Amino acid sequence: MRRLSITAICVLQAIADGFQYGFDVIDQTGLPSGTVYPALRRMEAGSLIVSKWEAPAVAQREQRPARKYYELTRSGQLALAEAASRYRLNERAAPRVGKPSTARR
């Protein structure tokens, strides 16, 4: 399995923690949109995540653009677990890897 970048690990962890659309991932990770959205595209192309658009009626009801929601695939879960075990020894490099979120939803 290919090693994940710190960015990819942070994004996968955010999705695993329940932050499932782009702006949520940006808020949770603190990474800029110019980093998060390309990472999401690469991870989807690599089958680590899948996406789906929310129902247009939901977005219309809430008077906002439709959101694209992301979910980890089994491959994404395995890649995140492997990264968590690899980086657990280096807490300064990836302090949240493998730990549940403490942020409120």
What does each of the following model-derived ranges do?
Residues 66:
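Exposed loop/turn and edge beta-strand positions of beta-sandwich/beta-sheet ligand-binding modules
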Residues 1-37:
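N-terminal helix-turn-helix DNA-binding core of bacterial DNA-binding proteins
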Residues 17-21, 45-47, 75-78:
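Short, charged/polar surface micro-motifs in flexible loops or helix N-caps
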Residues 5, 72-73:
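Residue-level signal for threonine
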Residues 46-63, 71:
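Beta-hairpin "wing" of winged helix-turn-helix
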Residues 75-105:
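Amphipathic alpha-helical dimerization/coiled-coil segments
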Residues 36-48:
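Basic amphipathic alpha-helical segments that dock to polyanions
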